Amino acid sequence: NSYTKEIMRDTENLQKKIFKEIEGRIKLDDESLPFKDKKYDYWTKTTKEGNYSKKLRKKIGSDKIECYFDGDLEAKGKKFFSTGDLAVSNNDEFLAFSVDDKGGEYFTIFVRRIGDNKIIEKIEDTAGGIVWSYDDKSFFYRKHDSQKRPRQILQHRLGSPSTEDILIFEEKDERFTCSIDTTSCEKYYTIETSEHTTSETYYFHKDEKKFEPKLVLKREDGILYSLDSFDGYWYIHTNKDAEDFKILRCPNDKMNDWKDFVPAKSGTLIGGLTFLKKWIIRSEISNALSKV
């Protein structure tokens, strides 16, 4: 702003020098490594001329590259532009993305049909955080309270007005904020509500006619835990009775029958799990060294 510009006027040359040095250490024309998701490889590209990244994909076995989101194109003509979330539907046909173009941290969600680039849905004044339903007939998103805290999870069905969106979950404690995610087994949704040192998780199955989140473990002050499901088991990463965390698991049909999967280790920080088709990856840190 004008005040900052005036106060810092005598450092303008130094600012330019520092900026050029920082810029010189960054590879502006760059592409991320691709990652496979269902039928496509996805990656991100940045250019020296642009201020925002491009999101690209290529069907596996094809040479045709699609740009399904161009940040510079979306930001054109806007004084402020910030992307909240990008989510491609499970059938690869739709892109849901959230944008704040005013700087107030209220995001408008758009749904674009990737094939013809047409916007087919728009929901204003959300907190972003988009998660598609497994059948691609709807998606979930977060809603702010009056203090800009995301404390509601709503479901929007494609083709219906946003006034008919269904409230799936609401956090009553003003200290907590909530988010929604899918599990690695692609059968459940999880809702996590948390503050800095305490968390609580709910889950519901994708085939439920009416989604009713079920509590996993009741919140306890100072206890953090996160939930995932894979290959018939629930997994919890928690610091309950484990200062540096541990991992428990139980069968999907025996939610309370928790057993140690990765026990706590004194002086070792236990990281979470990543599930692949045939492998489980985990990390830990001990003696200031990371291990996978």
Where are these regions (language model features)?
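Beta-propeller folds
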Residues: 1-292
